[in-house]
Amino acid sequence: QDKPFWSPPIYPH
């Protein structure tokens, strides 16, 4: 697990 999830889920529209 080398993927630090610090950014919130972004949904491009």
UniProtKB/Swiss-Prot annotation:
Keyword annotations of the record: Amphibian defense peptide, Pyrrolidone carboxylic acid, Secreted
UniProt protein name: Tryptophyllin-T3-2
UniProt GO cellular component terms: extracellular region
Organism in which the protein naturally occurs: Phasmahyla jandaia (Jandaia leaf frog)
Superkingdom of this protein's organism: Eukaryota
Residue list for modification Pyrrolidone carboxylic acid: Q1
GO aspect biological process, one term: defense response
Localisation per UniProt entry: Secreted
Main location: secreted
Family recorded in the similarity comment: Belongs to the frog skin active peptide (FSAP) family. Tryptophillin subfamily.
